[in-house]
């Protein structure tokens, strides 16, 4: 694997290996007074974010630093992109500056793929490119950390029924999770109003439903999504209140879930809209576990791309 641009870059076997790798990193760090491994010493990791981020950017930075990499942050507002430089010129500049890995977030779908095609393969000196979210397309490391969290909470993903609820249309998280969780043997159902489902969703390995209440009693997990108002130019539902009434996870709806079921959210959460504060803070919600797992999972991804299958503590 030269890059991680899409869930399509993974097989079921390689995805499971990454989940296992992340847990090995977690174990390798346990009990260390200084959380530092020499794994990526001498490697340069650059985060290149053209959209705002808290969880993804911070976890990649922490992941790189915990493996002793030199981590450099590049933001659109402080780079020459703000002066009109093209994305290609920026990417080639970062390659020439010695990047071993480029972690890219961009509002345009396909941007990470394009950067990977420009900067070349690692075997000809090009950096590994990791898609940290491209438009409404994909967010593969988010899906991996969600799968890790589900495996830890449920014991296994095979055969589990998992709902992805909310703004499917604008969600790269929904697409990557649908592909990965289905690959790992889960039964995935998308729950959303028709206006928030993408064209072509019938080709996804999922089923579709419009009633959240009808689905909740049969679920093992539910992944709640934020309504991405910043990507909307028109009215996709009558009002926030009506959306919350029909698709928000309230305390009453939480009680409809089986006792073992877990609630996930990729963040940021809009409390009071897609999830009630009491639900967000419930022990049945794994939001902070997702953040912790995000660091270990991104350590695993960087390790696999830059080093390969060796001793994680080495």
From Swiss-Prot:
It catalyses: carbamoyl phosphate + L-aspartate = N-carbamoyl-L-aspartate + phosphate + H(+). It holds the Pfam family OTCace_N. SUPFAM superfamilies: Aspartate/ornithine carbamoyltransferase. Pathway: Pyrimidine metabolism; UMP biosynthesis via de novo pathway; (S)-dihydroorotate from bicarbonate: step 2/3. One of its GO terms (molecular function) is aspartate carbamoyltransferase activity. One of its GO terms (cellular component) is cytosol. Keywords: Pyrimidine biosynthesis, Transferase. Gene3D superfamilies: Aspartate/ornithine carbamoyltransferase. L-aspartate binds at residues 83, 172, 226. GO terms for biological process: 'de novo' pyrimidine nucleobase biosynthetic process; 'de novo' UMP biosynthetic process; amino acid metabolic process. Signal peptide: none annotated. Its EC number is 2.1.3.2. Catalyzes the condensation of carbamoyl phosphate and aspartate to form carbamoyl aspartate and inorganic phosphate, the committed step in the de novo pyrimidine nucleotide biosynthesis pathway. This is Aspartate carbamoyltransferase catalytic subunit.
């Amino acid at each position: 694997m030269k890059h991680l641009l899409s869930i399509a870059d993974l097989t079921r076997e390689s995805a499971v290996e990454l989940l296992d790798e992340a847990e090995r990193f977690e174990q390798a760090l346990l009990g260390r007074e200084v959380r530092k491994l020499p794994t990526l010493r001498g490697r340069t990791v650059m985060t290149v974010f053209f959209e705002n981020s808290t969880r993804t950017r911070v976890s990649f930075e922490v992941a790189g630093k915990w493996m002793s990499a030199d981590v450099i942050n590049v933001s659109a507002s402080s780079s020459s992109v703000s002066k009109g430089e093209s994305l290609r010129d920026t990417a080639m500049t970062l390659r020439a500056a010695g990047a071993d890995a480029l972690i890219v977030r961009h509002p345009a779908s396909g941007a990470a793929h394009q950067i990977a095609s420009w900067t070349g393969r690692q075997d000809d000196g090009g950096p590994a490119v990791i898609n940290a979210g491209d438009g409404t397309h994909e967010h593969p490391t988010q899906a991996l950390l969600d799968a890790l969290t589900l495996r830890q909470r449920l014991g296994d993903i095979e055969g589990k029924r998992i709902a992805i609820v909310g703004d499917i249309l604008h969600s790269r998280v929904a697409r990557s999770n649908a592909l990965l969780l289905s690959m790992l043997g889960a039964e995935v159902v998308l729950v959303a109003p028709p206006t928030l489902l993408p064209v072509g969703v019938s080709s996804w390995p999922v089923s579709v439903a419009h009633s959240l209440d009808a689905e909740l009693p049969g679920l093992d997990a539910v992944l709640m999504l934020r309504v991405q108002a910043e990507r909307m130019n028109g009215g996709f539902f009558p009002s926030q209140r009506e959306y919350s009434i029909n698709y928000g996870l309230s305390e009453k709806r939480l009680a409809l879930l089986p006792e073992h079921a877990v609630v996930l959210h990729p963040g940021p959460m809009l409390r009071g809209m897609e999830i009630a504060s009491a639900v967000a803070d419930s022990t049945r919600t794994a939001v902070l576990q997702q953040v912790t797992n995000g660091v270990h999972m991104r350590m695993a991804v960087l390790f696999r791309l830059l080093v390969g299958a060796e001793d994680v503590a080495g």
